Structures are given as structure tokens and as C-alpha cells.
Design a protein with these regions (language model features):
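Structural motif marking the loop-to-transmembrane transition
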Residues: 1-2, 56, 107, 367, ...
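Active-site-adjacent loops and short helices of periplasmic peptidoglycan-processing enzymes
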Residues: 20-181, 185-188
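Domain-terminus/edge residues, biased toward the C-terminal soluble/receptor-binding domains
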Residues: 150-151, 168-384
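Residues in and immediately flanking transmembrane alpha helices
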Residues: 15-16, 74, 280-283
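Positively charged n-region of N-terminal signal peptides that target proteins for export
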Residues: 1-9
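Hydrophobic core
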Residues: 9-17
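Intrinsically disordered, low-complexity repeat and linker tracts
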Residues: 14, 21-22, 287, 384
Length: 384
């Protein structure tokens, strides 16, 4: 027999989970392509032509910033490293901070300029600093896109500028933008200290930066992320916001006006926050399993992975959690060894099954340990 522990979660947890794609009926979006995704689980809540390949303009820089943050977090480059502007970087058009050839600036200030003001010259300078050239950096961008499953994407440059013939092949989709936005915001949260800035300066306060993402100032909970515009791409935006422990990613490509992109993302975010919630159900109490011939008598078990799932606020079905643990386990026990299963279900339907695993290793008793244990039991049995 297996020990069964049941928990009924009331009201706030009385809601069935959503599948990885649960796109529903939401607001009308004024864009060629759009998508709303939950950052924690990757669940798609809304989509409109989400896999159509379109030019993303400066939303491209989400991938540029991702690779920069990965280089920083891995120790390849440092926040205070000095970056020197090349002739190529200084010649970039579009949004910029007007770097001069040979001008130096820290990684921090250049990344801030990219995140806040969409500076193409700084994006190129950082790309060259990391990979040696923009072309080499673009290879890294496409490699990372492939690793993330961005199957609709091909990058040609690190900026999103599309004013030359080669840039006709620079395409991605709303879905792919959500994927890279999720990777950046979830795994490299330090980027938010830049993407939430409304106004700031660089060059010792002599050059002002104003965020191109107006939601930073006007939408509660905004955490980022990146705007984009060219004549070919139209107005684009990857917008992220967090409320009540849930972070959402809203993407639009090809809006006709700047107001359309902000309003469309705002409406999608409003829809998501109004209709869904992220919950983290956990088994009640502690769960242990007796260890046969172990140097300790029991071993504790916990869920092997995050139990978070998205729930629809409109539904009120009970969620049941069952934890079934093995009656015993023979030593040696490895840390992370499966000792049972946590099952989350609703309305008789299994939503998730998560392994319960050992929190620590337990060594097997040696001959002398067994001998002493037997001797102790004999002595205790003879006591009056």
C-alpha cells in the first residue's frame, strides 16, 4: 500500500490548470500579429497570426540584450568594462546616442542606452565587444534563437534596421519574440533595472535618455520591454508587466500607429490580469519515507519541480492534490531519487504529475553499523 495524502485547495486554488496553449477570445488587436504569454509557464493566452514572419524593427534588440546579459551573468564581460565605439558602431543610423569613433563608455551605460533609448550605435558597439564583429554576434543571435525554439526567426543584424537589401531576410514572429522576451525577463531579471527606467542620463549627466516604451510611465506593473519602428515593420512592441505575482508578455507587430501598439498591448495585458492567475500549490506538511538499512531511519521528499500553474479565474472547479509516497526505500538513497508522486487533478482529470524526490543522500549501513544496531536491540530487549 502507498500512503495517500489529500489536500483540497479552497477558492483561490479551486481552478483547473491551462494547457501550454490556451489561447482564448480576447480584445481585438490593431496589429498584423499579436500574442499574449504567461512568463512563468509559457502558456499562450491570446494569439493573432502569431507565427507570421514579419520584420520586428528594434524589438530585435530583445535578443541583443539577452546575449549581453548572458555574457554579463556568465562573467565573460563585466558591468564596468570599457567599450570602445568603432567606426561601424558610430555610423549606425536611426535611434542612437551619437557615439563618436573611439569614444569609450561602460557596459552599464551602453546597455542602459540600448534598453531605454533603443540606441543602435550602442547595440553594435556591445555586439562587437562580445563577439569581435557584428556579423559574428549575429551568428550567436541565430544560434540562440534556434536553441530557444524560435523557428520563425532569422536575424541579419543586431539592431533591427531594415534599410538595405540584406535586411529583407531579417524576420521573426510574435510567438518567437515572446520566447526570447520570456528568456530575458525570467532568467536575467537584472535587465529590469534598465527596462523600467522612464528618464535617465549618460555621459556624466550631459546626455538625456527617455524610454521609448510609454507603458513604463502609464501602465501599472510594467517591467519592460522593447519598442520598434521602421516604415517596413510598422509600430512594434514587446511589453511585459507583473501584477499579483504573475508576469505577462504582450507582443504586437505591424501596428499602424504608435498609439495602436501601446493600446493593443495594454488591452491584452488587462485581459490576462483580469482572467488568469498564477498559483503555486504545495503538498501539506512534510513527507518522509522509511529507509531500510540506511544510516538514518527516514528521508524527506519534496516536489522535483516548480508546481506553479496558470488558472482561469472564471472557473470554480476544485483542485485536488494527492501525494503518494513509497512505503519504504532501500539504502543507499541518492539525492533527487524518486520516492513518490504528487498528482494535481480537477474534476476527475489529471492536470499534472510531479515526482517527489529525496532531499538528501542516505548511505547504506556497513557491517559494523548493522552489528552495533543488532547488539543494541538485543541489549534493550533484555532490560527489565
Amino acid at each position: 500500500m502507498r500512503k495517500i495524502f489529500c489536500i483540497l485547495l479552497v477558492l483561490s486554488l479551486m481552478l483547473p490548470a491551462l494547457p501550454a496553449s490556451a489561447a482564448g477570445t480576447g480584445p481585438t488587436v490593431a496589429a498584423k500579429s499579436a500574442l499574449l504569454m504567461d512568463a512563468a509557464t509559457g502558456t499562450v493566452l491570446l494569439e493573432q497570426n502569431a507565427h507570421e514572419k514579419l520584420p520586428p524593427a528594434s524589438v530585435t534588440k530583445v535578443m541583443t540584450m539577452l546575449l549581453i546579459m548572458e555574457a554579463i551573468d556568465s562573467g565573460k564581460i563585466g558591468w564596468n568594462d570599457t567599450v570602445t565605439a568603432s567606426e561601424t558602431a558610430a555610423a549606425k543610423g536611426g535611434s542612437q546616442i551619437y557615439l563618436k569613433v573611439g569614444e569609450t563608455m561602460t557596459v552599464t551605460d551602453m546597455l542602459k542606452s540600448v534598453a531605454v533609448s533603443s540606441a543602435n550605435d550602442c547595440a553594435c558597439a556591445l555586439a562587437e565587444h562580445i563577439a569581435g564583429s557584428e556579423d559574428a554576434f549575429v551568428q550567436l543571435m541565430n544560434q540562440r534563437a534556434s536553441e530557444l525554439g524560435m523557428n520563425d526567426t532569422h536575424f541579419v543584424n543586431c539592431t533591427g534596421l531594415d534599410d538595405d537589401e540584406a535586411a529583407k531576410a531579417h524576420l521573426t514572429s510574435a510567438y518567437d519574440i515572446a520566447l526570447m522576451s520570456r528568456e530575458l525577463m525570467v532568467n536575467h531579471p537584472d535587465i529590469k533595472k534598465f527596462t523600467t527606467i522612464w528618464m535617465d542620463t549618460v555621459r556624466d549627466g550631459t546626455f538625456g535618455l527617455a524610454n521609448t516604451n510609454k507603458l513604463v510611465r502609464f501602465y501599472k506593473g510594467t517591467t519592460g520591454l522593447k519598442t520598434g519602428y521602421t516604415t517596413k515593420a510598422g509600430f512594434c512592441l514587446s511589453a511585459t508587466a507583473r501584477r499579483d505575482g504573475m508576469e505577462l508578455i504582450a507582443v504586437v507587430l505591424g501596428s499602424e500607429t504608435s498609439q495602436d501598439r501601446f493600446q493593443s498591448c495594454k488591452q491584452m495585458l488587462d485581459y490576462g490580469f483580469a482572467n488568469y492567475a498564477l498559483v503555486h500549490p504545495a503538498p501539506e506538511g512534510s513527507h518522509t519515507v522509511p529507509v531500510t538499512l540506511g544510516k538514518q531511519q527516514t528521508v524527506s521528499a519534496v516536489p522535483a519541480e516548480d508546481t506553479a500553474f496558470l488558472i482561469d479565474k472564471a472557473q470554480l472547479s476544485q483542485v485536488k492534490i494527492q501525494v503518494a509516497m513509497d512505503d519504504s526505500v532501500a539504502a543507499p538513497v541518492s539525492k533527487g531519487q524518486r520516492l513518490g508522486t504528487m498528482t494535481i487533478s480537477a474534476g476527475g482529470q489529471v492536470l499534472r504529475q510531479i515526482p517527489m524526490v529525496a532531499t538528501e543522500a542516505v548511505q547504506k549501513k556497513g557491517f559494523w553499523d548493522v552489528f552495533v544496531s543488532i547488539l543494541r536491540k538485543i541489549c534493550m530487549a533484555r532490560e527489565p
